[in-house]
Regions:
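Phosphate-binding/switch loop-helix module in NTP-utilizing enzymes
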Residues: 96, 102-164
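General beta-strand structural signal in soluble alpha/beta enzymes
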Residues: 42-46, 133, 154-159, 177, ...
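N-terminal charge/polar-biased segments
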Residues: 1-10, 36-40, 331-359
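Short active-site-adjacent helix-start/loop capping segments
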Residues: 21-22, 50-54, 81-82, 164-166, ...
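A generic structural motif
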Residues: 43-46, 277-285, 344-355
């Protein structure tokens, strides 16, 4: 099922609600599925992944297994990480490491990481690897383009922690949100927070796309065709845009960049003027406000839309916790399905992928 969901898209980001959410298990399943379909894939990460044990929790975790022909973008120092990448058996022995996969270097990127420059290579054998890619979304977008130029048919970006900016359409065509019991001992909190994150990723695209792209400032207030004559007013400061909304009559407000709680509070002060107001942001990853303030705005009659819609393909659930507070897998799956209301498929990494534990 996972392969069929992703098949129409050229790139996908795996986004974790927390560490040990099941991302590596999902990634390995995708790699295996695409191998069966004989498609060329490329892998990178916005953080480090593939190590044998979690560097924070010190718990055992699954490694990333790749096949001959896979394109990989990873940090230079990981080229000789134990049991991972090497030019040859002799090189591995010289560095005191066991040979993992042999590889062919395709390109250097000039993108720095704490573990050295990001190098693009092709696996020449099957084996385990570690990933560590660039930390900036703009760099990921450029890296993705280069991997396509080098022959990749699909690109998978493995996210670190809660880097929901990976869901930006500029970074990938689609996203999978991974949640698990490691997020919180409280199953209700995990479900509620995951459903809220999913809701932000599924916000509809505004019908005012043409007009909002014409807006040059960070904020814009749009009026209808009534007494205001279809006007739009642009501002560089939120306070001035919020003040105009409070005066009433506005149909929409555009907010570029991040939208934190301070921005939400400025709009909440508009009171009745929020009824029917469309709040437009660039994409769901820019909404940094709390669930509480989001609900306040929605209850006041506002609705959220985005300039660039994210394609959330699935939410995966992992009932196992690295901290020991496991969930009942049926209860967790059912609660997530109920919370999402059928708007997106929910996949249990234990039942779907036939594993007893997942990272």
């Amino acid at each position: 099922m996972l392969y069929e969901l992703i098949k129409p898209y050229s790139s996908v980001s795996l986004i974790g609600m927390c560490k040990n959410a099941g991302k590596t298990t999902v990634l390995n399943r995708l790699i295996k599925d695409w191998r069966r379909m004989d498609e060329s894939i490329a892998l990178t990460s916005i953080g480090r992944d593939g190590e044998r044990s979690d560097l924070v929790t010190n718990t055992k975790k699954p490694e990333i297994f790749v096949y001959d022909g896979t394109i990989i973008a990873t940090a230079e120092k990981l080229l000789f990480a134990g049991g991972n990448l090497s030019d040859s058996g002799n090189d591995a022995q010289k560095n005191g490491m066991n040979s993992g996969i042999s590889r062919e270097i395709l390109d250097t990127t000039g993108m720095p990481t704490p573990m050295g420059e990001v190098i693009i290579l092709r696996a020449c054998s099957d084996g385990f690897i570690q990933l560590a890619g660039p930390s900036m979304t703009a760099q990921l977008a450029r890296l993705k383009k280069r991997m396509f130029e080098l022959g990749a048919a699909k690109v998978i970006i493995d996210g670190a922690l809660s880097r929901k900016s990976l869901a930006m359409p500029a970074v990938s065509d689609s996203a999978i949100l991974c949640s698990g019991a490691s997020y919180s001992p409280d199953i209700r909190k995990t479900v509620e927070d995951t459903c809220f994150s999913a809701e932000l990723m599924m916000l509809p695209q505004t019908e005012r796309t043409e007009y909002v792209h014409q807006c040059k400032q960070k904020y814009g207030v749009f009026f209808g065709s009534g007494t205001h004559g279809g006007e739009q007013t642009e501002f560089s400061e939120l306070s001035r845009a919020a003040e105009l909304v409070r005066k009433g009559g506005a149909e929409a407000v555009l907010m570029r960049g991040g939208v934190p709680d301070s921005a939400a509070n400025a709009l909440i002060a508009a009171g009745r003027a929020l009824n029917g107001l469309e709040i437009i942001c660039e994409d769901g990853s820019r909404l940094l406000l709390s669930h509480k303030n989001y609900e306040k705005l929605v209850r006041a009659g506002a609705r959220f839309t985005v300039m660039n819609k994210t394609r959330l393909l699935a939410v995966t659930v992992n009932p196992f916790s690295a901290k020991g507070s496991h969930y009942n897998k049926t209860e967790f799956y059912d609660a997530m399905c109920s919370g999402l209301g059928g708007r997106v498929p929910v996949l249990d990494v234990v039942s779907e992928f036939g594993c007893e534990a997942a990272e």
